Amino acid sequence: MKRSLLVVTAVLLAGLWASRAGLRAQDNPKADDYKISDADVARVNPVKSSPEGLAEARKVFGYDCEMCHGAKGDGKGEVVESMKLTMRDWRDPATLAKLSDGEIFYIITKGKGKMMAEGDRVPEKLRWNLVNLVRALAAKGGGEQKSAAATPAP
């Protein structure tokens, strides 16, 4: 009896979370109408890439980003097909060549299309470390990067 009640409670909570997440994702700008201000584009990453920062970002990536972006950042996450997503391969430097750190930070913070915003859940420094991690994925096909903070905006 207790187990049944626990299972029902877990299912209800998961449904509530999923519906809330769906509403938040729907509020995000569609990929086609996405416009980032010049000030946000020009933002420079104030957080120097470090093994500790990348490890912390990797944890968040693992439970928040990996399901869509894939464990290696290749865009082959487990929900891509079922959600009908078109994902980019972050390991390819050409994918990120035209994006500044400020743009990546903005997308992580505000979300985009079906991607949920992390701004209200993840501290700013950790979001900048996620930018460093995304740059590191492209730097060595999923490896580490020397310093994303020094990467100039295009």
Placement of each model-derived feature along the sequence:
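C-terminal segment of classical bacterial N-terminal signal peptides
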Residues: 14-22
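Detector for the c-type heme attachment site
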Residues: 69-75, 94, 109, 119, ...
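Electrostatic cytochrome c docking/interface patches
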Residues: 28-60, 151-154
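Short cysteine/histidine-rich zinc-coordinating motifs and their immediately flanking basic loops
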Residues: 78-82
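C-terminal capping alpha-helices of c-type cytochrome domains
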Residues: 106-113, 119-148
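Bacterial N-terminal signal peptides that target proteins for export
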Residues: 1-9, 19
